[in-house]
Amino acid sequence: MGCFSSKHRKTQNDGGEKSIPINPVQTHVVPEHRKPQTPTPKPMTQPIHQQISTPSSNPVSVRDPDTILGKPFEDIRKFYSLGKELGRGQFGITYMCKEIGTGNTYACKSILKRKLISKQDKEDVKREIQIMQYLSGQPNIVEIKGAYEDRQSIHLVMELCAGGELFDRIIAQGHYSERAAAGIIRSIVNVVQICHFMGVVHRDLKPENFLLSSKEENAMLKATDFGLSVFIEEGKVYRDIVGSAYYVAPEVLRRSYGKEIDIWSAGVILYILLSGVPPFWAENEKGIFDEVIKGEIDFVSEPWPSISESAKDLVRKMLTKDPKRRITAAQVLEHPWIKGGEAPDKPIDSAVLSRMKQFRAMNKLKKLALKVIAESLSEEEIKGLKTMFANIDTDKSGTITYEELKTGLTRLGSRLSETEVKQLMEAADVDGNGTIDYYEFISATMHRYKLDRDEHVYKAFQHFDKDNSGHITRDELESAMKEYGMGDEASIKEVISEVDTDNDGRINFEEFCAMMRSGSTQPQGKLLPFH
C-alpha cells in the first residue's frame, strides 16, 4: 500500500498484509545539535510554484490561467506509468505508479480539480504540498517526490509505504507489550517534535495517518497525511474546528488553540495503544465532545490495573486539559517510560487487541444503516428537518450542493467556517457523489432528535436481512452496500471484520445493535459541527 496524504483518503490497507510481527518501530529522534534554535521558525517565503519539485525536462511553455499550483501544465504520464488503484477518497484516487526513467515505484494521488469547489479547497491542496515539501527529508515523515498539474487533475507523487497500517500490524502479531507501545509512540511524537520545531502544527494526528515504510519487522513508521496541517504564525490563535472526534483536544472545541493540540492527540493514541479503546467515548460525537471537555481519564477498568505507573504518568501528562501545563514533544521523548527503559516487555492482555480491532476504522455499515433509518422515519419524527432541507436546496433539485449548504447555513445564522462546512458536506455525503440528498441530510442530523430507538434499529437490520434469517450474510451486505455505491471488496471485508464479534462470518441482531450504539459515525478526520 502507498504512503499518500489526503484529508479525504480512504484507508489504504483494506485487505492488506496481516502476517507481519510487531517490534518497537524504528525511529529517529532529532539530535540536539541538529534542532533549529527557535521552536517556530518562519515558513518558507518562496512562491508555491518554486517550492513544488518537478522534472526540469519537457516543460509546457505556456502557463494556463486555470492553474491551481501556479506553474505550467504537465502530463504526468511522460514521467510515470500509473498502475493499480490503492485507495479512493472524496477528491480523487491514489494509484501505484512507476517512474519511467528509473523503474522506481511510488504512490500517486490524483485529485480531480472539478471537486475542488471553493477557493479554500484549492488553497488547502497548495498548502498540503508546500508543507510536505518543507518537511521532506525528515525521519518518520513520508517523502514527496513531486507535484504535477494538468487540465483535469493535480497529481502528487510520493513514497510508497508497503507495510500497511499501524493497527493492522499490531493486530496481526497477536501479542503486544508496553515496550512495543513505547516504540510506536516514540515515532509518533518524533513527528510532532519535528513539525513543531519546523513551525508546523499537524492538527489531525490519529493512527490511520501512520503507515509502515515496508513489510520488514523493523520498518519505519511514517506520517502520511498533512491535509489539515498549517504553518505556525507567531501569536496567532487558531479557531477552526478540525481533527477527528476521538482525538480532538478540548481547546479545539473552545475554538482557541495552538500547537499543543498535537500532544493531546498523541496522548489519545497512547491510551488506545495501551487499552484498545479511546479515553473519551460516547454514543455520538456530541457526547464524545462533552467527555473531552470533562477530561476524566479512566485508569480503573481493565487492563489499566496491570499497566505500569510510568505509562499512566505519561498518559496523564499528555492529556492534561490545560495546554499551558501539557507536556511538550521534547519532554515526552525524555520521559522515563519512553527513554529510560521503564516500559515492561510483558504481554498486555489479549482483550486489548480485540478492542483495538473493533475500533480501528470507521464503520461504514453504521453510516449506511443511519441512512436506511432516515428513509423509514415518519414526517412527525423528523419535523422541521424537511423544511430546513427545502430552504437550503434553493434550486429545488432534490440535492444540496456545497455552495447551497454554505449559503443556507449562513442564512440560518450559522457561523461555521468554510473548512467546517466542507467537513459537514463530506460527513453527510454517504455515496461520495459531491451532493447531499434528502435522506443523507436527515441521517446526518437526526441524532440530535435521539432517533435511536429499538424499532428504528430493527427496521434497519431487516432492510439488510433480506431473507429474514436473523443474520446479515456477506451476500446481503454486498448487495446493500453496492446499492449505495460502497460495495467494493475491501469495504465489505472491513465491515464484516469490525462488526462480526463472534467470527461466524455474518452479523446477527445483537452485533448490529452493538455497532449502532458504539461511538462516532463520522468519517475519520472530520467533525460534524451540525448539532
From Swiss-Prot:
The modification Phosphoserine is found at S244. Keywords: ATP-binding, Calcium, Cell membrane, Kinase, Lipoprotein, Membrane, Metal-binding, Myristate, Nucleotide-binding, Phosphoprotein, Repeat, Serine/threonine-protein kinase, Transferase. The active site is at D204. Residues 343-373 are annotated as: Autoinhibitory domain. Residues 48-60 have a biased composition (Polar residues). A lipid is attached at G2 (N-myristoyl glycine). Ca(2+) 2 binds at D429, D431, N433, T435, E440. It is found in: Cell membrane. PROSITE patterns: EF_HAND_1, EF_HAND_2, PROTEIN_KINASE_ATP, PROTEIN_KINASE_DOM, PROTEIN_KINASE_ST. Signal peptide: none annotated. The keyword Iron does not apply. Belongs to the protein kinase superfamily. Ser/Thr protein kinase family. CDPK subfamily. Interacts with SLAC1 and ABI1. This is Calcium-dependent protein kinase 21. The gene is CPK21.
